[in-house]
A protein has these predicted regions:
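Juxtamembrane helix-loop boundaries in multi-pass membrane proteins
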Residues: 7, 11-12, 38-59, 101-119, ...
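Hydrophobic alpha-helical transmembrane segments in multi-pass integral membrane proteins
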Residues: 57-65, 116-134
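Membrane-proximal helix-loop-helix units in multi-pass membrane proteins
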Residues: 63-120
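Transmembrane alpha-helical segments that form the membrane-embedded catalytic/substrate-channel core
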Residues: 21, 86-95, 149-161
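Alpha-helical transmembrane segments
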Residues: 5-20, 71-85, 140-147
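Membrane-interface helix-loop junction between the first two transmembrane segments
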Residues: 24-44
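Core segments of alpha-helical transmembrane spans in multipass integral membrane proteins
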Residues: 19, 23, 47-62, 79-90
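Terminal transmembrane helical module of multi-pass membrane proteins
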Residues: 122-169
């Protein structure tokens, strides 16, 4: 398993996730003036998961960059992250149903529930397979990291557009 071959990839992806996490804080702060976003359950359903996705990408980058990682440690950590992500996505779906500040449409269910669920499930499976196929697992984990980054970017943009078009209530 040649982790050093992935250094630049995870520096770029992890740094992007960290920077976008900061920008999401700005989006949430701007959204404080929009009445429908004053419902904490709506923020938990549509804002917080974006931060979680970015932080997961940052965590993946950090884990791969730690010296001395073995297929066992990485596989275990990725499996744990995958399980946590699947559980968190199920909770996100429940929160999206409970909140009253916004009526989710199909696109919301896809980008906030279905795509993240599939991506975290892929991380879980990849983590479990890292014990048998460590080199191949690194490619799948890279795909998971990019998928979560793009899901987060889409959802952050969607939030920004929603806030800007709703105006001040």
């Amino acid at each position: 398993m040649r982790l050093h071959d992935w250094d630049n990839f995870y520096v770029i992806v992890g740094s992007s996730a960290a920077a976008l996490t900061g920008l999401q804080f700005v989006v949430i702060a701007l959204g404080a003036e929009v009445a429908s976003l004053r419902d904490p359950t709506a923020v938990e359903a549509f804002g917080t998961p974006t931060i979680v996705h970015f932080c997961c990408v940052l965590t993946i980058g950090a884990l791969v960059s730690v010296p001395g990682q073995t297929p066992f440690t990485l596989g275990s950590l990725f499996t744990f992250l995958g399980i946590a992500g699947v559980i968190y996505t199920i909770r996100t779906a429940h929160r999206a149903k409970l909140q009253s500040g916004y009526e989710p449409v199909l696109e919301d269910w896809l980008w906030h529930v279905a795509f993240p669920f599939g991506t975290y499930a892929a991380l879980l499976i990849t983590g479990a397979s890292a014990f048998l196929y460590p080199a191949g697992a690194l490619y799948f984990v890279a795909g998971v990291a990019l998928s979560l980054l793009f899901i987060g970017i889409h959802n952050a943009w969607d939030s920004a557009v929603y806030i800007s078009t709703r105006g001040r209530d």
